[in-house]
Swiss-Prot record:
The reaction(s) this protein catalyses: D-glyceraldehyde 3-phosphate + pyruvate + H(+) = 1-deoxy-D-xylulose 5-phosphate + CO2
Gene (name only): dxs
Assembly information from the UniProt record: Homodimer.
Entry EC number(s): 2.2.1.7
Gene Ontology biological process terms from the UniProt entry: 1-deoxy-D-xylulose 5-phosphate biosynthetic process; isopentenyl diphosphate biosynthetic process, methylerythritol 4-phosphate pathway; terpenoid biosynthetic process; thiamine biosynthetic process
GO molecular function terms attached to this record: 1-deoxy-D-xylulose-5-phosphate synthase activity; magnesium ion binding; thiamine pyrophosphate binding
Name used for this protein in its record: 1-deoxy-D-xylulose-5-phosphate synthase
Cofactor annotation remark: Binds 1 Mg(2+) ion per subunit. Binds 1 thiamine pyrophosphate per subunit.
């Protein structure tokens, strides 16, 4: 091994392409150690990045990036890619406000050819790039790197179906790399597979195959027999028949940590025309024993000491909203045998581990397939079961037609537990739950609740489960106010909010009522203390408590709505619609997320930047209303 470190000398992939095979292996070792040390200091995705080190090195060595396009599916496994493409010195800013994104972004680097974070988009995007190159007469390569988990989504197969077809007379030059890190569809990887990969990707095999085809096509029966024999022979040692049927030349599986296998295979596939499919097998957490042993725990850890590993905090943290949901789900399942739970590959993130253990026959993980998850749940509801779909707010976007056509149109009794609603912090714009209020409340038959804290979240879930129709309950990532959660199934009065703070009888300025939706109730209450304003905990976005809105409008000089969602079509819009229907012209200030994508960073900092912390709410109200004349309206007691 070279005594001098190689990684500090790598300023771009051009430097990687100059290295020898031995140096590439050394670089991979240094890169893996750098990823481990870096993520341990910043937090972030670890297991997946440790598993893609050799593949990343090989890709940048073989392909002329950024002229050749690499499209990484999901994108949370791109830390090695970022490090090799000139961003090593900025890794200390990863996922922080103003720092590097945890995902590929076109505005961050020319090497990030396509922005990703949601799954199963890479093949479609790479195919578009390949066809664009073909149409413009440019001789560059397009490569999609997709994990086996992402292959469960229909979009990936839609792209494969299209990618192997001739376009303008020929199949585009597209390479799809299946990064199989779960061994779920792989036979043992050994010398035979390595040899076969080199053989099937090589020029001699391709030339012999095409030559034999041209001869045998003159005798159709012999050609069909030969085709079946080839398919059977390859199927004995490789599981690629389905990809061959899509029109791809399948190669693999090969060891994704073996540069001696990866590099010659990639070179062969680079030089072959048409649609190619390479199956590589990797191991999540590779090279760090603790992550190899528990890749789920090390999927997205916070800061930790690599020598010790993850350590449980001495004092247990506050209960999270996700944990409240998980406990409610188990309790309700014990009480009602009709409850079934569905998740699109988010068992841990959605708090369903315990439910899976206790009720395995009523637990359905459908994989990364949100469209299927929603319609599958609709089918369960049609047969009298009570499905609960646990899904992140941002991922429900992927099943919007199913939500309308298959659920709401039939008014099926279902619960959608929308985790990660609002700002999500380090994952940034791609994962923000900013739009669910707007896109759910406009659907007929759909109801939407926004509980203010942990205790109310449990009651909201029970309320939704008891309702005869589709209901979504939105709640944020992390913990809330720390309220004690009861163990029963108390419900909320349907469609009713409550006044949590009443303004005093002698307000100096205009009488203000703040209508808070969701967890922003607490910063609204803090702001109201300084303003002596009324605060309503609205609870329901749809059906909106129009009677409470009208009452507050008649007894206050102005209303302020506060929500952790986009303003266009949001809860504030619902209040304005209610006032219009009542013929009231009370001034309204709507506060929420601005009309822009919110960057990654600490959630508290992001909330403050959006003016949704207590100081921001107070300042916005002061600026808009508090120079007005004193009010002559009298308060009305909470009904």
């Amino acid at each position: 091994m070279n005594a001098q470190p190689l990684l500090p000398r790598i300023q771009s992939p051009a430097d990687v392409r100059r290295l020898s095979r031995a140096e590439l292996k050394q670089l991979a070792d240094e890169l893996r150690e750098f990823v481990l040390q870096s993520v341990s200091r910043t937090g972030g995705h670890l297991s997946s990045n440790l598993g893609t080190v050799e593949l990343t090195v090989a890709l940048h060595h073989v392909f002329d990036t950024p002229e050749d396009r690499l499209v990484w599916d999901v994108g949370h496994q791109t830390y090695p890619h970022k490090i090799l493409t000139g961003r090593r010195d900025r890794m200390s800013t990863l996922r922080q406000l103003g720092g590097l994104s945890g995902f590929p972004r076109r505005d961050e680097s020319e090497y990030d050819t396509f922005g990703t974070a949601h799954s199963s988009t890479s093949i479609s995007a790479a195919l578009g790039m390949a066809l664009a190159a073909q149409q413009k007469g440019e001789k560059r390569h397009a490569v999609a790197i997709i994990g086996d988990g992402s292959m469960t989504a229909g979009m990936a197969f839609e792209a494969l179906n299209n990618g192997g077809m001739p376009h303008a007379g020929r199949v585009p030059n597209l390479l799809v790399i299946l990064n199989d890190n779960d061994m779920s569809i792989s036979p043992p990887v050994g010398a035979l597979n390595k040899y076969l990969a080199r053989l099937l990707s090589g020029r001699f095999y391709a030339a012999a195959r095409e030559g034999a085809k041209s001869v045998l096509k003159s005798a159709p029966t012999l050609f069909e027999l030969a085709r079946r024999f080839e398919e059977h022979a390859k199927g004995m040692v490789v599981p690629g028949t389905i990809f061959e049927e899509f029109g791809f030349n399948y190669v693999g599986p090969i060891d994704g940590h073996d540069l001696d296998a990866l590099i010659p295979t990639l070179e062969n596939l680079r030089d072959k025309p048409g649609a190619q499919f390479l199956h590589v097998v990797t191991k999540k957490g590779y090279g760090y024993k603790l992550a190899e042993a528990d890749p789920i725990a090390y999927h997205g850890p916070g800061k930790f000491d690599p020598q010790i590993g993850l350590v449980k905090p001495a004092t247990p943290p506050k209960t999270t909203f996700t944990q409240v949901f998980g406990q409610w789900l188990c309790d309700m399942a014990a009480a009602d045998p009709k409850l079934v739970a569905i998740t699109p590959a988010m068992r841990e993130g959605s708090g369903m581990v315990e439910f899976h253990k206790r009720f395995p026959e009523r637990y359905h993980d459908v994989g990364i397939a949100e469209q299927h998850a929603v319609t599958f749940a609709a089918g369960l509801a049609c047969e009298g079961l009570r499905p609960v779909v646990a899904i992140y707010s941002t991922f429900l976007q992927r099943a919007y037609d199913q939500l309308i056509h298959d659920v709401a149109l039939q008014n099926l009794p279902m619960v959608f537990a929308l985790d990660r609603a609002g700002l999500v912090g380090a994952d940034g714009a791609t994962h923000a739950g900013a739009y669910d209020i707007a896109f759910v409340r406009c659907i007929p038959n759909m109801s939407l609740l926004a509980p203010a804290d942990e205790a109310e979240t449990r009651r909201a879930l029970s309320t939704a489960f008891a309702h005869d129709g589709p209901v979504a309950v939105r709640y944020p990532r992390g913990s809330g106010a720390g309220t004690a959660v009861e163990t029963g199934f108390e419900t909320l009065p349907w469609g009713r909010g409550e006044v949590r703070r009443q303004a005093g009888g002698h307000v100096r300025g205009p009488r203000i009522a703040i209508l808070a939706f969701g967890t922003l109730l607490y910063p609204a209450l803090a702001a109201a203390e300084k303003l002596d304003a009324t605060v309503a905990n609205m609870r329901f976005i749809k059906p909106l408590d129009a009677a409470l809105v009208e009452q507050l409008a008649r007894t206050h000089d102005a209303l302020v709505t506060v929500e952790e969602g986009c303003l266009m079509g949001g809860a504030g819009s619902a209040v304005l619609e209610a006032l219009q229907a009542a013929g009231l012209q009370t001034p309204v200030l709507t506060l929420g997320l601005p009309d822009q994508f919110i960057e990654h960073g600490d959630p508290a900092l992001l909330l403050a930047a959006c003016g949704l912390d207590s100081a921001g709410i107070e300042a916005a109200i002061q600026k808009r209303f508090c120079a007005s004349a004193p009010s002559h309206l009298r308060p009305v007691a909470n009904g």
